[in-house]
């Protein structure tokens, strides 16, 4: 690594609402595994309307990988739509949890 390289962008936050067949198909457990693999923090939970809500924090490239995964999810799921919100500033979250 050279000292003249620009600094890497800081942590960002990604907030997703995923709709389709995403509950009862291990979506949250697989999202947690993917987040751990990508060294992201945050949480994932089922919503009463049948969607899954996911909040992740970390490096942008890793968040983009999680977003790409969220568009198809685990094999048993069917993702119809992913509502995506990027946030620059956030309060840090420890670990990645299923709520």
What are these language model-derived features?
Residues 1-99:
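Intrinsically disordered, low-complexity, mixed-charge
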């Amino acid at each position: 690594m050279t000292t003249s390289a620009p600094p890497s962008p800081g942590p960002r936050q990604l907030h997703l609402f995923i709709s389709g067949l995403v509950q009862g198909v291990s979506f949250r457990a697989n999202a947690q595994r993917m987040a751990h693999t990508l060294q992201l923090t945050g949480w994932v939970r089922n919503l009463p309307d049948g969607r899954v809500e996911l909040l992740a924090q970390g490096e942008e490239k890793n968040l983009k990988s999680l977003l790409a995964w969220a568009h198809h999810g685990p094999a048993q799921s069917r993702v119809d739509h992913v509502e995506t919100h990027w946030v620059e500033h956030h309060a840090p979250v420890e670990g990645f949890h299923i709520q």
